[in-house]
Swiss-Prot record:
This is Para-Rep C3. Pfam families: RNA_helicase, Viral_Rep. Residues 3-98 form the CRESS-DNA virus Rep endonuclease domain. Belongs to the nanoviridea/circoviridae replication-associated protein family. Initiates and terminates the replication only of its own subviral DNA molecule. The closed circular ssDNA genome is first converted to a superhelical dsDNA. Rep binds a specific hairpin at the genome origin of replication. Introduces an endonucleolytic nick within the intergenic region of the genome, thereby initiating the rolling circle replication (RCR). Following cleavage, binds covalently to the 5'-phosphate of DNA as a tyrosyl ester. The cleavage gives rise to a free 3'-OH that serves as a primer for the cellular DNA polymerase. The gene is C3. It comes from Milk vetch dwarf C3 alphasatellite.
Length: 284
């Protein structure tokens, strides 16, 4: 039988004499409890964990307590039941910070803002994701174009102002370097609903893209990687069926939402690897 796990639990702890002190640890996000007397003295409570825990793990937090996985429709109801007045003798008491349903993402960023160094030690992967989001939002809020627009840049803007379709890939070609391709690519990618990639292996690129599958995408190909342009990824993004095989294989379908794809490169497309009719070439 699979082990029962949950982030939300209710508990009862019988006692005699003085009210016991509950030894909550850093795994507990929030707890509320009160002294009740229905035939005998006991503590009735609700606990919200930071991550899913098994029954055995919960019993280790409060030895001797009877635990059950939350059965209420939501955590608000379970919390209210644990603090009901009709059977209360003393309390209620609270520990930690309660996270309402639907607010998890906001609370994670609040934790990051409150103490990024603690998160860096506790969960380095989560810290890096929060840092990435924060830095992107900061750059996006201050992004400005302080240069005169070149004709090819005007042409790109005209192309992306049109409604995207399922085929056209905008390919910005500048063989010499110094035309402003990368500067313009970075600027475009800071627009809301846009993402940036420098190319790379299929599984890495699609893992990143699957995090924001509805984005328009800018691919800024370094000169050193010009002969390794990943045409398969470009087509998957345009076709709106994306297969991410990294860590956990998933298929993302977004058939009714075409997006723009722009490639900035020092080379022309290799038409042995992609259909010529897909390409809208913009010369720098």
């Amino acid at each position: 039988m699979p082990t029962v796990q949950s982030t939300c639990w209710v508990f009862t702890l019988n006692f005699k004499g003085e009210i016991p002190i509950l030894p909550f640890n850093e795994r507990v996000q929030y707890a509320c409890w009160q002294h009740e007397r229905v035939g005998h003295d006991h503590l009735q409570g609700f606990i919200q964990m930071k991550a899913q825990q098994s029954l055995g793990q919960m019993k280790a937090i409060i030895p001797g307590a009877h635990f059950e996985k939350m059965r209420a429709l939501n955590s608000d109801q379970a919390k209210a039941y644990a603090m009901k007045e009709d059977t209360r003798i003393e309390g209620p008491w609270e520990y930690g910070k309660y996270i309402k349903k639907g607010s998890h993402k906001r609370k994670i960023m609040e934790r990051f803002e409150d103490d990024p160094e603690e998160m860096k030690i506790e969960d380095p992967s989560l810290y890096r994701r929060c840092l990435s989001r924060k830095m992107t939002e900061e750059q996006r809020s201050t992004a400005e174009w302080n240069y005169d627009m070149k004709p090819w840049q005007d042409q790109v803007i005209q192309e992306i102002e049109e409604t995207p379709d399922y085929r056209k890939i905008i390919w910005v070609y500048g063989p010499k370097g110094g035309e402003g391709k990368s500067t313009f690519a970075r600027y475009l990618s800071l627009k809301q609903g846009w993402g940036y990639l420098p190319g790379g292996p299929t599984h890495d690129m699609l893992h990143i893209i699957s995090g924001e599958p509805k984005n328009n995408w800018v691919f800024d190909i370094p000169r050193v990687a010009s002969e390794y342009v990943n045409y398969g990824v470009l087509e998957q993004v345009k076709n709106r069926v994306m297969v991410n095989t990294k860590y956990e294989p998933i298929v993302i379908r977004d058939d009714n939402h075409p997006v723009h794809v722009i490639v900035f490169a020092n080379c022309m497309p290799d038409f042995t690897k992609i259909s010529e009719d897909r390409m809208k070439i913009v010369h720098c």
